[in-house]
Regions:
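Selected alpha-helical membrane-embedding segments in polytopic membrane proteins
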Residues: 27-116
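Membrane-proximal helix-loop-helix units in multi-pass membrane proteins
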Residues: 105-156
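Hydrophobic alpha-helical transmembrane segments of multipass integral membrane proteins
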Residues: 35-42, 46, 71-74, 104, ...
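Terminal transmembrane helical module of multi-pass membrane proteins
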Residues: 140-206
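Membrane-helix interface and helix-disruption motif detector
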Residues: 54-60, 120-128, 173-181
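N-terminal juxtamembrane cytosolic/stromal segments of multi-pass membrane proteins
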Residues: 1-30
Length: 206
């Protein structure tokens, strides 16, 4: 007698279990990636906030520092993800690839939108800063929510919710305190997530 096809819930459970097992076996857990992003956000946005409070550092220097740190984080994330994906086949690989494409497509789309709004010239430089920081933190939160649902990861889902709250807070506090929110709330959220995932990996918890 043929086996009955799995339900959607059973399929998601299987994908989540396989993903956790692969991460443990291949050393591609999220702790290292989150730590890289925590470093980029804490140092990058922290330096940018400091630069706005002193006249000795040109404003563009903060942008360069953030860009360099983010390129590092993106490169490291790609390396860890590729290493973790070696030898993986089936639903887990497909879901992981689609999730990665979602990040890329969303980032490109949001960049086009923010650039176009900025080009209208109706916003001040302070408001442009709030636009970019708020929308990007919001996008990060939404995609982490999606990842948490896909892999049934409550910590990832909670991190996404925290990022969304931080996005709203960064706009409410205004410029230049929004950079401080990005550093403390955004970077701090990544750091806390990295620590929790690291403890889980060491203890073998799912």
């Amino acid at each position: 007698m043929d086996d009955e096809p799995m339900s959607a819930e059973e399929s998601l459970n299987l994908i989540a279990q396989q993903n956790r097992r692969n991460r443990r076996e291949l050393g591609g857990g999220p702790a290292r990636m989150l730590a890289a992003w925590a470093l980029a956000w804490l140092l990058g946005w922290g330096f940018t906030y400091f630069a706005t409070r002193t006249e000795s550092i040109p404003g563009w220097v903060g942008g360069v520092v953030v860009a360099v740190l983010f390129v590092f984080a993106i490169t490291y994330t790609g390396y860890v993800s590729a290493r973790a994906g070696r030898g993986i086949r089936g639903p887990s690989k497909t879901v992981g690839a689609m999730y990665g494409y979602s990040w890329a497509l969303s980032a490109i789309g949001l960049t086009v939108i923010d650039i176009r709004i900025t080009q209208f010239g109706s916003l001040s430089s302070d408001q442009v800063s709030l636009l970019w920081s708020g929308t990007w933190l919001l996008l990060t939160g939404v995609l982490y929510l999606a990842g948490g649902m896909l892999w049934q990861d409550k910590l990832m889902y909670g991190l996404g919710a925290w990022m969304i709250v931080s996005a709203g807070l960064s706009v409410l506090v205004g410029f230049p305190a929004n950079f401080l929110v990005l550093a403390i709330c955004g970077g701090g959220g990544f750091l806390l997530g990295a620590i929790v995932y690291f403890v889980r990996e060491k203890s073998g918890r799912r």
